[in-house]
């Protein structure tokens, strides 16, 4: 049996609140206005909604927001709560710890006895609710089911809930989150009087076995979660609050993993034939900040699986980040706004940072007359060697991002806690390996046979461009108070020794095309990380431009280098054997580069 979304409803409380009006609702923040400006610029949110007045009084319950979204969807479909056989809800935090959120929404909604399910979690809990509703219809248990995602977070964002010790991991969320609810009606047949969305398939997977907790409440810090350490173990809620346990927090040091696992799952769905990028007409992606959009675009593009941005739809800027409700709030505007036409294929993507989950839903827009057409087609074409290579390299990069997130110095940079000593140590250790970069590229060029003269010329040009890069590191080191003699006579750490030895070994072979995998990792660090790191380091340490020249230069130069590299990776040079060797070398270099950075804290 097939399930169809036959109506979508949303509810956003109060009037839209602009950035200039935020403090009149949340009150003055305990941290600097500089942080607020930086977060608002990064997240791209211009308007949001709060179930709260200007005096800080909560005006509605979370269950009320959910009820209004459900009623909006049912009314649009011409149904009432008495027609509903199952109600599934998703939210981060209900109004009460007990009972379940779905029971509270049902109590307010009415409609007689029905099956209820409360999905816990963060952003993916809305999709979890949808999957439950879909399953209940597919299995023939219910004719009509409703799924709703709802969030009421504003009451936890008021300044009087925060102290100077709240910490950046809690404070920055004040400018990211807002209130709202979205709901969908799921039925066994398309609606007879308009368009419906056939649910072709849905996919939700957790990667919690690979990652620590990222977004949480109820503990002082994620690493301290153990028996006797949670908020329920304190003598009173006041004591838990005093320790900051009741704040919603997000570990920004590992947050970027969310992009990597999302793209990793996306590539898997493409390879299984469930997603065919060229056949997707609309992509609705939930992301908490515009900052992540460019990262998603870069990884999809590098994998050769990009869905053109003109097919993307988001209302983050105008509706805010409403967590579990966001994907439904987005779908409501697109569906009810006439964005879809019969035959259109829609892909929903929802990553969740709680402990790293990601979900996808594939929909097809149908009219009643064609609602019984077959499921979405899979990919039948054989995968070319270059296509396979680009997808494999994207997976290597995604796993490399995970490795980097566990490196202490990277976590400190990403979380805003790096010190000048950290930056000095980073420069010192990079310099010893960077100095040899041009040498191994030159050796590789000398071992490229005359049959590949154009590629040899590319290697030689690249070596010439990088032969004096280490001098920029020397100057940066001195500019932040380091001794030139110390950095010029420094030794490679064990990770750098292993990396250099591997690179020279590979470069000494005939036609060492596998080193394109090494370049993919090393140049990718410059293109994807250097610019971000230099911005964070400059802000954290209040450095001038002449103190961050190396990272600044490589943020731009490596982008140009990667463009040339991708031309080669897409060329006729690539056979399956060469592609496999490139992927193998990329994996090795990724691990050794991470080891090089890990060893900074062991020096």
Predicted regions and their residues:
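Acidic-glycine-rich active-site phosphate/pyrophosphate-binding loop
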Residues: 37-41, 96-110, 152-163, 229-238, ...
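Short acidic, glycine/serine/threonine-rich loops at helix termini
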Residues: 17, 98-100, 131, 156-161, ...
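Flexible, glycine-rich active-site loops centered on histidine and acidic residues
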Residues: 138-180
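Non-heme di-metal
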Residues: 382-603
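Short glycine-rich phosphate-binding loop at a beta-alpha junction
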Residues: 82-90, 277-286
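Condensing-enzyme catalytic core mediating Claisen C-C bond formation in acyl metabolism
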Residues: 1-60, 168-256, 351, 362-379
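Claisen-condensing/thiolase-fold acyl-transfer catalytic domains that form or cleave C-C bonds
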Residues: 63-67, 93-95, 107, 112, ...
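Short beta-strand segments
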Residues: 9, 90, 120, 145-151, ...
């Amino acid at each position: 049996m097939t399930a169809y979304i036959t109506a979508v409803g949303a509810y956003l409380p109060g009037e839209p609140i602009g950035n200039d009006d935020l403090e009149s609702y949340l009150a003055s923040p305990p941290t600097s206005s500089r942080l607020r400006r930086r977060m608002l610029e990064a997240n791209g949110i211009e308007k949001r909604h709060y179930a709260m007045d200007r005096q800080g009084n909560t005006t509605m319950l979370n269950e009320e927001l959910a009820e209004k979204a459900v009623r909006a969807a049912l009314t649009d479909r011409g149904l009432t709560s008495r027609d509903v056989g199952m109600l599934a809800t998703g939210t981060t935090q209900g109004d009460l710890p007990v009972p379940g959120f779905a029971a509270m929404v049902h109590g307010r909604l009415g409609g007689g006895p029905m099956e209820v399910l409360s999905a816990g979690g963060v952003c993916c809990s809305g999709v979890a609710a949808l999957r439950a509703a879909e399953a209940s219809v597919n299995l023939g248990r219910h004719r009509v089911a409703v799924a709703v995602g709802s969030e009421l977070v504003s009451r936890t964002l008021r300044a009087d809930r925060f102290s100077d010790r709240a910490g950046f991991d809690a404070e920055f969320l004040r400018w990211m989150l807002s209130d709202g609810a979205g709901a969908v009606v799921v039925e066994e047949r398309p609606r007879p009087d308009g368009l419906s969305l056939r649910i072709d398939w849905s996919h939700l997977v957790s990667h919690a076995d690979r990652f620590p907790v990222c977004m949480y409440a109820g503990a002082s810090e994620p690493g301290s979660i153990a028996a006797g350490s949670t908020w329920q173990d304190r003598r009173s809620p006041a004591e838990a609050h005093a320790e900051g346990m009741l704040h919603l927090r997000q570990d920004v040091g590992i947050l970027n993993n969310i992009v990597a696992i999302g793209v990793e799952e996306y590539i898997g769905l493409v390879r299984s034939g469930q997603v065919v990028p060229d056949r997707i007409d609309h992509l609705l992606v939930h992301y908490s900040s515009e900052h992540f959009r460019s990262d998603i675009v870069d990884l999809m593009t590098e994998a050769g699986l990009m869905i053109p941005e003109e097919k993307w739809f988001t209302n983050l800027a105008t509706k805010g980040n409403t967590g579990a409700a966001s994907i439904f709030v987005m779908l409501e505007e697109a569906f009810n706004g006439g964005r879809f036409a019969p035959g259109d294929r829609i892909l929903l993507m929802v990553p969740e940072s709680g402990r790293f989950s990601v979900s996808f839903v594939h929909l097809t827009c149908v009219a009643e007359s064609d609602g019984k057409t077959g499921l979405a087609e899979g990919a039948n074409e054989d995968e070319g060697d270059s296509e396979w290579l680009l997808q494999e390299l994207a997976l290597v990069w995604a796993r490399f991002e995970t490795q980097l997130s566990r490196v202490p110095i990277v976590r400190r940079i990403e979380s805003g806690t790096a010190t000048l000593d950290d930056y000095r140590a980073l420069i010192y250790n990079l310099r010893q390996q960077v100095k040899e970069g041009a040498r191994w590229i030159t050796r590789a060029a000398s071992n490229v046979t005359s049959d590949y003269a154009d590629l040899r010329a590319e290697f030689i040009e690249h070596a010439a461009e990088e032969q004096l890069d280490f001098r920029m590191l020397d100057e940066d080191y001195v500019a932040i108070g380091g001794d030139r003699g110390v950095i010029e006579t420094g030794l490679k750490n064990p990770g750098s020794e292993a990396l250099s030895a591997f690179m020279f070994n590979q470069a000494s072979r005939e036609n060492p095309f596998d080193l394109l995998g090494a370049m993919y990792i090393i140049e990718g660090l410059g293109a994807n990380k250097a610019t971000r790191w230099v911005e964070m380091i400059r802000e954290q340490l209040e450095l001038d431009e002449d103190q961050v020249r190396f990272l600044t230069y490589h943020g731009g130069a490596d982008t140009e280098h990667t463009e040339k590299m991708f031309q080669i990776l897409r060329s006729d040079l690539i056979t399956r054997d060469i592609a496999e060797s490139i992927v193998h070398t990329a994996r090795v270099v990724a691990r050794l580069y991470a080891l090089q950075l890990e060893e900074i804290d062991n020096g």
